[in-house]
Amino acid sequence: MGAVGVLALSALCPSALVAQDSATPYEAIDDAGARTAIRTLIADAAAKGLPTSPLVTKVREGIAKRATPDRIRNATSLLVDRLEKASSALAPTRSSEELAAGADALQAGVPASTLRDMRKLWPGKPLTVPLGVLSEMVASGVSQSVATRRVRELLIKGASSAQFASMGTEVRNDIASGLAPNAAMELRSKGVISLLNYQAQVLNGMQPASPAPIRPGTPPKK
């Protein structure tokens, strides 16, 4: 199901949400107890207003990887916990994609307090992409403190989701080319901030010099 379809379905009611799991191949789980437990976990999550599509995906992944029934059940239970924490931290959002991104960030080791802070900074805008980039940066080797600080600065500056996504791609490419993860994050985030500052000055009627191009290997300006 596409993102728009999931959002439309989740807006209906918990009973509509639980219908998302109807196509899940539960019968491929040969342990009846685990099968029942997983169904119950997903039904309970739906009753709480949590998105079930990430849970269904987790079950499918476990089946595809031939994980044991207990491992699939445990993984599903842990994801329910993360979705609950993300829902609390990112309130009042009910976006399936945003809550899933929050759950991924928690799994990457980002504390719930960071999610709450990001929501305060962007109270009316979706955090799906910024959260996804934060998770990817930490997973790519950027220290949590550097990744969090830089993402926070970009939120304050008003970076767009497209700018977040582009920066994330550039950081990954820089790391693949041999640049240290923290240096890549510092370099690329400063490039975005430089552009945002330039755009703000133009909007205010100033005539600033064009921002210098940022290239891999260029030492970040202090």
How should these model regions be labeled?
Residues 2-14:
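Bacterial N-terminal signal peptides
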Residues 18-222:
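General marker for long, soluble alpha-helical cores
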